[in-house]
Amino acid sequence: YLLGLSKSVRGALAAARKTRGFSPSQVVGIGVDTTGSSPLPVDRRNRALALDPKWRKDLAAQCWLWKDHTGWREAARITALAARHRPEYIAKCGNTYSSEWWWSKIWHCLNTAPKVFAAAYSWVELADWIPSVLAGVAAPEGVVRGICAAGHKAMYADAWGGLPDKTFLSKLDPKLAALRDRLYAKAHDAGTPAGRLCPEWASRLGLPEGIVIAIGEFDVHYGAIGCGVTEGTLVKVIGTSTCDCAVVSARRRIPDIPGICGIVPGAILPGSIGIEAGQSAVGDIFKWWVEGICGGGDELHAALTRQAAKLPPGAGGLLALDWHNGNRTILVDPLLTGLIAGFTLHTTRAEIYRSLIEATAFGARSIIERLREYGVPLERVVCAGGIAEKNPLLMQIYADVTGCTMHVAGSAQACALGSAVSAAVRAGAHPDFPTAQRAMTRWKKIRYVPNPARRKAYDRLYAEYRRLHDGFGGLDRKADYSRVMKNLLALSHP
C-alpha cells in the first residue's frame, strides 16, 4: 500500500506537469480512499504488524481485505448475540452483521491466529491508517477515525456511546472487550481533517509540507462524492463487486431497512445520512466465466460481449443467481452460492455470459426496489468504475432490467476524485461540498435509456429470478420451482 501510494501520487504529479503552468506547490490538499472493511493490525507506534520482520510472512498480520469471508461463523455469532441483547447495534445494517466487516475479521484473527492478535496493540481501518501515515501519526490513539468505516462496519454510533460496549464484546470474547480500550472513542465525518502532510511524506511524494489531509473514507463513499451525489441519486461503483450509495437529508426520517449494509449519519457527506448496499461479486463473476472456465482473456471478454449483444433477454432459456461470492444485499448471507438454470445441449458460452450479466442486473434491481420500498428517494442512477466505462452492453441491460436511465461518471477515477473533492473543501479551495462537487464533478454525455420492449421481457424474467432468489435465499420456504424451467423456455421462445 505504501509503495503504491508513492508511485501513484508521483505518477499523478508527473502527468499534471504536462499541463502548462502546473506546479506541485499549487496542491493544497490530499485525500485517500480505500477498500473496506479492511482492518490492519498495528503496533504501539501505529506501524503495520506486517512490516515487522517477525510477522512479515504471516498472512494474518496483513491487511484483512473486505473480500475475505472466513469470519462468517464469527459474523453469525455477532448477529445472534446482538439480536438477543443489543438489537440496536444491527438495526441500521439490515439486522445482520457481515463477515466482510470489522469485528468479524478481528475476532476471526483471535480465533485462528492468536499469536498475531496478541502481538497487535490495536487495529486500524486501512481508510484511516493511510491518512494517519501521511500525517506522521506515531500511535494508534492519535489516528483520526472516520465515521464512514466506524458507522458502516464497526457498529459505532453516538447514540450508544460509540463502539459496542464492553459487556457485549465480553460475551463474544473477553479479549475483544479488552481491545476496545485500545481502539477509539470518537469517529468523525468529512468535516474533520485527518491531519497535515508530515515532512517525511512530503519529501517522498514531492508535495508541499503541511497541506491538509482529508479524512479517510471507503472507495465507494468517496466515489459517490466524485459522481456528484445528492439526494435522489443512487451511485453504483461497478467493478469486481458493486457497491451502491445514496444520501438523504439528515432531517429526513429513514426507517431501518432490512438487508441494507448501513444507514449512517455523515458517512458520505456532512449533514446527510449515508446509505450503503451492494453485491459481493460482479466483475469477478464475468472473470470467473471467461478466464477461469473458458480459459480466455481480454479478447474473449470482447468476443463474448459482441456475441451476447446480439441475443435477446433470457437467451437460450438461461437464468442465473449472482451469488458466486455470497449475497451482500438484500439477503446478507456469505454462504449462498451461484446457480444457473436452463442448460440444454444447445447452450452457448455467449448465452451463459449474457445470463451472468442479467443476473447481476437483477441483483441491482432488487436493491433499488428495497430502497424505494422504505422511502429512499431515487430519481437517477450514476455508475462509475471500470465496467461502467468499458461495457455498454452491461449498462444497457441494467437500464432495461431496472427501468432506470443509467448515467456514467465523468471521471474514470471517480473514487479518487471524491477524495480530492473532500481535500479541496477541507483546504478551503471550495467553501462546501455542493460547491466543490459542482466545480469538480460531471457526468458523461452518454446515457443508457430503458428499452420498453426489453423492459417488459425482463419484468417476466425477473419474476422467475425472484422465485429462485426468495426460495434459495430463505425468504420463501414454500417456493415451488416446478414451472421455472418451462417458463424460461417459454420466455426464450415467445
Where are these regions (language model features)?
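N-terminal glycine/serine-rich phosphate-binding loop of ATP-dependent small-molecule kinases
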Residues: 1-51, 178-181, 203, 207-215, ...
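Active-site phosphate-binding/coordination module
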Residues: 19-101
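Glycine-rich phosphate-binding/hydrolytic loop that grips phosphoryl groups
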Residues: 76, 222-226, 275, 279-280, ...
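Gly/Ser/Thr-rich active-site cleft segment
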Residues: 80, 86-217, 279, 291, ...
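A short helix-loop
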Residues: 90-92, 110-113, 132, 136-139, ...
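Glycine-rich phosphate-binding loops at beta-strand->alpha-helix junctions
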Residues: 187-197, 217, 240-242, 246, ...
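Activation-segment/catalytic-loop signature of the eukaryotic protein kinase fold
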Residues: 311-413
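Cytochrome P450 heme-binding "Cys pocket" and the immediately downstream C-terminal segment
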Residues: 425-494
